[in-house]
């Protein structure tokens, strides 16, 4: 086996017949598989042991050699090598074909590579390959030219012969006629009889003339065809071809089937053809030039690589190892076999029949038919169903060919190479574990014992509870079955599990927080326990969700799990850098209850000298937790009353004691916060809590934040329980004035209806009016209802604290349901006046079901679409890794941070959170000669606040859009890693993080927005489809034109459409745009517009923006438009993630003129490669190539990647592989996917080359500690210890570390 860690690239190419024979261990001659009586493989068959290796370890077929001591011997009786049976997974065979066949990928794929190479239409190519037409493969021009006069003479002689013969025949017939007539005359026959005889004779003579003329024409036709014969002519007329061959066989060769193609390829001159094509490209135009370019691409691929075009025609085909196409016996004596065996059997059967026919010397027509069938059998084996009807198995199911094995979700790439099953894992249902710390999880004992079995067994042997591993295993087995005398097993498990993190994962893993590490705590029962605060990250709830547990084994893996993946280190969300572990639901309610003031509660107005005294009063029942009291507090830094209007008393210093008016509940809450944090003195809802947690995350280290969160969780649950909040039907309080409000609006609605009946308004206007009236009514009822709820009502408290639900839901329960939409998405103008507490009437219930069902259907569709979007995003950005500290670019982009109000004060822009926040400054910010923020520093919340205070409106920041790194991006341009809150590390896979951040909220985006019944104006795509449209760079529906010039607007109305005409300022000719009558204009007659102004309402085409305004503008446009969609759904995503995807979309340029470079016009090249090649050419004094930037959609960009492994595993597998093989593409293995596929460590994070060759050396103390372990020879252990985490990057094989001397 080759070791994947030792090569840097992987090349794919075309295999020639010799290659295939070289790989092979023998020829498969018979279609037999397994002998049904002995169940052993048949000799020379598809499972033959002589070719593929023994079925049993170290045992030959006939049984002469058994045991490992005969390793490597080849048995002289049966010819089987004695070796391991697993060679049957790697040894290949081959089938020698009696006639060559073409490879279907190269002839039938679009575009047909073989057709391009030979300049044949695929239709004609098909005729030749499938024996419907002959092809001329060689013409001896010289001989033909030389012998033409003599041949012509021969032909004319032949024609004269025919004419002579005809004349003789005619004379003969005339003589016979004379005789017949004379005889009739003698008999005295009637004139009638004479006429008949004469006519018959004339008819025969005419036939003789015609026959002769036909022969002469035929000779002419054959000769003309011969004179004009050239290589690659097709001849579909069998008879004509035969005659040609019989007459002029020595001057040309021709044939049909793959044999003809093969002969043609052998004599094909690639260089000459390429030269001719270049000439054509230089002088040609239009269609011709385009075709020449395409052909040159294929031909230069063969010229530039070591590939031979002969590889597209096969003389022998490989047979893949038998263990990859197994045959297993089912109970009942039947066999289940892989489809490949059936396909191979058809090939072998037809091949053997063809050999036999050839030996018998069968007629050509029979042989050709058999050859055609062989070609079809090989086609079906390579790619079933690509041509004609697929070969089907039992039950009319198409058989899975080699191509199908690679394709799709179930194919080799996605099923086995990118998604493997792993050992040391388990899964179970999750339940909540409120007693856990943030970094812990509860692991069921039974599960833990199974997962940690090897560790436990080894420890049992170490502690002398067991003599050897075998008996330790038995002990573990018995402990599981509950025998009390093996209780020490559980103690050992406790010891082993300490400090050994496990990974928990919940599917679907939409972003990196879907897998986190925890320290396991053993629990009884069979359910995994989860900390309530990490549910948001996993998107988990406890209604039966399951989670998987994985065990990191090696020392390195454990270190990574503990440092990088521990849940308390993953408090921030990578999408926007804000905490993801927020108290929710019960916790929010508990804290809200705790910090609320209840007027008139026990002990109100009392004053206490310390918080301890207040707590004592409460314990004695003298004080209510929600009563307003005054307390003298120590160590107060500041007091936050929620409004920011608190002023400290005179002479008070932060840290001095202070008398604060508050409640005991608030004092208890503040104990959960860091001691030097301001005293929070107001009622806390979910929003306030999130502000506080945000602030904590900005100011304090993660450990502190995690501790605070845990405290809050405990407090929240404790007080939510004490609050004893319940809901009964009477808690749903209905507004008493509801009827009255509705009657008033009903009157308005009736008035509108009457106006309509009188014909004063149209139907559309009536609908609009009614919808407005009832929307107003619903809002009024809702307002009335809200005002009417008592402040201590449980329903109101739940909504108000942000624990669960919102006012809209309460409105439907207690107010009125309001307007609903019909299946078409239009709003029905009659509202539902009842609420759920009163109950709906039948009609009301019926019309409200539409929306509900549509919602469910939408969600299902959305999940699938969103998953597919994430997959495409990951694929396009997977090789964007932070590869260097700083690319040193001077370029940057300006971003606004504040906007001036009417009174001249600067207020923070709401979009700062997702645009400027967490970036690196590109230059110093200087105000009044003082540097406020230095170049290269990170912009956090505090910096932004300070800049705004000094009146700074915009800053220049680094961005990945302007990064000049050749591969990936640099740390400075990316800025702060949002997940860690520090500058991003070199090696961070920022591309994948970006893809996950954009894809994960995809399910929350709506599919379609409701149209408010028949409103004019184009329906613009919204939600998920809009995001897809942007990332795929599609031209949107109802596209709005943008101005190509700066000038004045003139608007012309015509019958059908409007014309917007712009007269440029520089006096060049005017530009006109046709827009539909319905489009709403954005410009007015006579207005002055700049280049790139949008002329009508609607969506602009990003390709136009790129063409007219350049790459920078289209980058801004795409980022803004994507953000627009996410903001409308209230999903915060940082711009830098979208920028990474946009950077990938604009990575390539389209070559216009190739100059002296090796590019072809129309080729798509990555920008760094283009610039490098141009520099090289200019240095040598040549002309550089010119190109223009192109915007590629993410699917297209993924398929255009340099890495063929990544592209093939993404989509259109066969097309990508066909192309890659012809171009002998080499995969530099720079992305993540290609390394996962071949099983190398990914080149990101700790797998980066710069981190790989690090050795872990123990400190002196650690060594000393190890030596003091009893019973171990000091020297031997020390020598083995240095081997941990060797530079190989391999996992440490645990079983091999018996603490003994183990030297590699």
Swiss-Prot record:
Mg(2+) binds at residues 541, 543, 545. One of its GO terms (biological process) is DNA-templated transcription. Pfam families: RNA_pol_Rpb1_1, RNA_pol_Rpb1_2, RNA_pol_Rpb1_3, RNA_pol_Rpb1_4, RNA_pol_Rpb1_5. Keywords: DNA-directed RNA polymerase, Magnesium, Metal-binding, Nucleotidyltransferase, Transcription, Transferase, Zinc. It catalyses: RNA(n) + a ribonucleoside 5'-triphosphate = RNA(n+1) + diphosphate. SMART domains: RPOLA_N. Belongs to the RNA polymerase beta' chain family. PANTHER family: DNA-DIRECTED RNA POLYMERASE, DNA-DIRECTED RNA POLYMERASE SUBUNIT BETA. The RNAP catalytic core consists of 2 alpha, 1 beta, 1 beta' and 1 omega subunit. When a sigma factor is associated with the core the holoenzyme is formed, which can initiate transcription. This is DNA-directed RNA polymerase subunit beta'. The gene is rpoC.
